[in-house]
Amino acid sequence: LSMTMTFAENEELNTTNTANAYKMTVNYSRLADALCLSIDQLEAVQDIHSEFCADMMNAGNANADERKPMVEKALQKDLKHMRYVLTENQYRKYLMLLNVTISNRGLEK
């Protein structure tokens, strides 16, 4: 019985860790400072990133074999929209921050 409970506990912990890896919330004021965003850009970035967060949480809750394509699609959509809102320098910095975040969470392409 204790072995079963241990496995169930580990499975629950793995599920929690997986869900946390896909949680992409950010501190918008820090992001605005890092990217030197205008008020209008900040509002657009918040909208775009909120949609990205929802897409990533959907990927985190999907079956393991569906996650990678869902993450790819979410990333491509996010980057496409951010490229429209950000300047070239802001976009480069955003891309660097996003790549580091994705890498740190073990979600590399």
Place the predicted regions along the sequence by residue.
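Charge-rich (acidic/polar
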Residues: 7-109
